[in-house]
Amino acid sequence: MISVPALIFDCDGVLADTEQDGHLRAFNETFQHFGLPVSWSVADYAEMLRIGGGKERLRSLLTPQFIAAADLPADESVQSQAIATWHRNKTEIYTALVDAGVMPARPGIARIAQAASAAGWILACASTSAEPSVRAVLTHAVGPKLAAKFSVFAGDIVSAKKPSPDIYVLALSELGVDADDAIVIEDSENGLRAAVGAGLRTVVTVSTFTANENFSDASLVVSSLGDPIPGEATRVLSDPLRLGAGSIISLVDLSRILAVPRIKHESHIHYNREVAP
């Protein structure tokens, strides 16, 4: 029996460079809307990106000083409700920014997704962001017709966010695909660690906030997937498999990476299908 390969994309920083003009802006507008005593700079947000998940980043604010300044009750259940409310508002703002076209798709995303679909590959997106945000970016990046072919794994469907491998282990299980037959496109060290932890070979397309991170476990590190138009060629930053990729990363390149034996990892996950992102 011939196995069907799968191409799994992260969302933020991979489909589009969403962090500074999308998520950061949406967080700060949410803080202002609710009168919260915080505003993140670009440098602040770069540190926040070490924490996987938007709700988790909001929860990191809840120091005793912040709780007092924001006039929040000490009851943790009420605090959790406040975080959920802030996060819903942030997601609405972010989705509106995506719909407004503030964040263009990164080079090569639509091209390689279309090529994979035409070749019969399984398509998926695995992200710690809220599902409405992920679907909005995906639709903007590849178009509604192609986006409908993607399986989306997002938000709180797993209890442990990246760099835990849970989201990728779940995706493989739900897609019915072995790690030998799947390849991931990521942009961050946390995402790479999650994918490699699930035994997946990974191509990293560095983004604005991740250029200086450690990608030593990646199968290939590039500036982008590239497109065959002036100014959109990829730059190969690390090529440990000696693929010798050209000005664009093609489905042939991904297939060659899949032909390389992977390192197997044991992963144990706990996921929640009932929790809304």
Task: Report residues per predicted region.
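N-terminal helical cap/lid subdomain that shapes the substrate entry/recognition surface
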Residues: 2-11, 15-107, 114, 118-119
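Conserved long hydrophobic alpha-helices within structured protein cores
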Residues: 22, 26-27, 51-63, 126-138, ...
